[in-house]
């Protein structure tokens, strides 16, 4: 099994780290030629959906990736990845893959500036680093 991770922008490194910890081989998708090989699934990471969509089109990856998803390639999508898949975006007229029959709302929980990081100590556990981000819904 080999999983592809869209690596043109966004939080792809975190997904790669987790796949690595699980012992799952992965490859980064950065250019059209990376889509020639067939993969067992793809991760569409969080990041900025408008930038990811623009880069996918500029790199001539958009149509091929959309076709592979339409043909049934399994997808794990987080944040911006969900927006790329959504059939409809409530507060944005841009369209991307439109392969998932859901409606999402961009920046539903606030802008990126509303995100923050904090370390909190929990009794009996210790200090836990926590990142709170805005996300679509």
Each model region followed by its residue ranges:
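Active-site oxyanion/phosphate-handling segment shared across diverse enzymes
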Residues: 120-137
